[in-house]
Amino acid sequence: MGKDKKASGSGSGSKGGKDAGNKDAGKDAGKASKGAQSINVRHILCEKHGKKEEALAKIRDGADFGAVAREYSEDKARTGGSLGWKQKGTLDPEFEKVAFALETSSTSSPKIGEVKTQFGYHIIMVEGKK
């Protein structure tokens, strides 16, 4: 995943502020209709499909996501695969599509997604949304 792209034309400088024109959207309803604008995301990046499958098997067998990332990931391995908080528009489009669709979960019981990008094969989990 390496380098982040700057979001172009993201317009509003507001950080999670409420829309004055959308009065009937409550806190939760606004998130459901608009979706998260940033996620706290981890991933395991593998160049080879076989290595990704090995990592997936360990996670499905109950291994901690961070521990598997440290063992298998070719990117961010030392941080347990953590990319930190990322805003919409700053990640690879294919990666972002999968990541923003995932439910939040913990490293000990991750809800994961998979995607292949120009960088390789990713196993993705999301720890938080806002």
Swiss-Prot record:
One of the GO BP terms on file: rRNA processing
GO molecular function: DNA binding; peptidyl-prolyl cis-trans isomerase activity
UniProt keyword annotations, A-Z: Isomerase, Rotamase
Biased composition (Basic and acidic residues): 16-31
EC number: 5.2.1.8
Family the entry assigns: Belongs to the PpiC/parvulin rotamase family. PIN4 subfamily.
Role according to the record: PPIases accelerate the folding of proteins. It catalyzes the cis-trans isomerization of proline imidic peptide bonds in oligopeptides.
Entry protein name: Peptidyl-prolyl cis-trans isomerase pin4
